Amino acid sequence: MACRAIVFTDLDGTLLDSETYSFEAARPALKELKRRQVPVVLCTSKTRAETESVARKLGLKHPFIVENGGAIFIPPGYFTPEQLTSAGVRPKRRGNYVVLELGLPYQQLRRFLI
């Protein structure tokens, strides 16, 4: 079985310039990855809304990981229901996405920590 490439990248100071938040320097690499059909998965501490905005500007249509791994947002139709269930995944629907929530709700964490 051939190994297929996938790129996981942070945003701040990695894909985006740390001072200007520009991704112009990364644009040629992103274009080449798209040409080669290599998925680029954003992994960040940012929220869904922030990450979704960046993904849209970059033209990325792949899953993205937000809030330091708290959730994975998967575009509809990216994986079949069979692929998800065979992997033991029980996703929720949120807006246009299938979501895997990996963290605990804020109120539950707060009760535990305080």
Question: For the regions a protein language model found, what residue spans apply to each?
Answer:
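A short acidic/small-residue loop/turn micro-motif
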Residues: 23-24
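Active-site phosphate-binding/coordination module
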Residues: 27-114
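Asp-based phosphoryl-transfer active-site loop
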Residues: 4-20
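Short, small/polar residue-rich loop motifs at catalytic or cofactor-binding pockets
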Residues: 1-4, 59
